[in-house]
């Protein structure tokens, strides 16, 4: 898939998702943002709450109907709710898993039939905390460990028909950490990756020749402490 075509990007209104949408557009692709917020970029947008799986699936089908199919999907939407498991509001805990894991699966479920027609690709977004556990992050770790496992199983299931890449990024310079208690923010000396640089790796995965797969990408700064 050397040409990007129509690319669905969840979470494309901010952070990594916005950087991916911009990178896709700069390379001649057509990004379509699925997000609860409208992107400031002016890219085509579907209002979607990824916590509602059927809503997410319907949005994918609407995009495919408008564009005559889709060529790729990037599931960059992600949220967190920090704290000890007994202290986190259960509805907040459940929403983290719903958005990060179930939302990812919903996008894939709806997208795969279209991607199979064109040997398209899907890039799921996990985290280094999908490989390494951290206290006070049970919801996030559960969801991101789940994304890693889901992506590996999906790659087996769709082998030869759809390219599946799991991106495993470390901390990035986004609003993801805003609004947290200080104890849950990166330390002042933490070096975080610019999302634009991480987005370049997503485009790299999307543009591999047919038959060549980038199965997993661990992308961090050289001083990242969360992996290994």
Q: Language-model features: where?
A:
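C-terminal helical subdomain
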Residues: 160, 166-167, 186-227
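Substrate-binding pocket helix/loop in short-chain dehydrogenase/reductase
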Residues: 84-85, 92-94
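Conserved glycine-rich cofactor-binding loop
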Residues: 13-14
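Residue(s) in the substrate-gating loop at a strand-loop-helix junction
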Residues: 127
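Alpha-helical segment proximal to the catalytic Tyr-Lys
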Residues: 113, 155-157
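Active-site helix of classical SDR
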Residues: 108, 143
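Conserved NAD(P)H cofactor-binding loop of Rossmann-fold oxidoreductase domains
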Residues: 76-81
């Amino acid at each position: 898939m050397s040409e990007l075509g129509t690319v669905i990007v969840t979470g494309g209104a901010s952070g990594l998702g916005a950087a991916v949408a911009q990178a896709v557009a700069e390379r001649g692709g057509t990004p379509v943002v699925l997000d609860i917020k409208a992107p400031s970029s002016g890219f085509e947008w579907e209002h979607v709450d990824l916590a509602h799986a059927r809503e997410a699936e319907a949005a994918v089908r609407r995009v495919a109907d408008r564009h005559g199919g889709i060529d790729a999907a990037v599931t960059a939407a992600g949220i967190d709710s920090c704290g000890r498991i007994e202290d986190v509001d259960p509805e907040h805990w459940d929403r983290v898993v719903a958005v990060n894991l179930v939302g990812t699966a919903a996008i894939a479920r709806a997208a795969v039939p279209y991607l199979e027609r064109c040997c398209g690709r899907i890039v799921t977004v996990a985290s280094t905390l999908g490989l390494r556990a951290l206290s006070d992050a049970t919801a996030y770790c559960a969801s991101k460990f789940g994304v890693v496992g889901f992506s590996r199983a999906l790659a087996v299931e769709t082998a030869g028909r759809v390219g599946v890449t799991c991106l495993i990024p470390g901390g990035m310079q986004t609003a993801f950490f805003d609004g947290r208690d200080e104890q849950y923010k990166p330390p002042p000396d933490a070096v975080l990756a610019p999302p634009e640089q991480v987005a370049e790796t997503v485009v790299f995965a999307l543009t591999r020749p047919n038959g060549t797969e980038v199965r997993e990408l661990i992308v961090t700064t050289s001083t990242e402490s969360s992996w290994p």
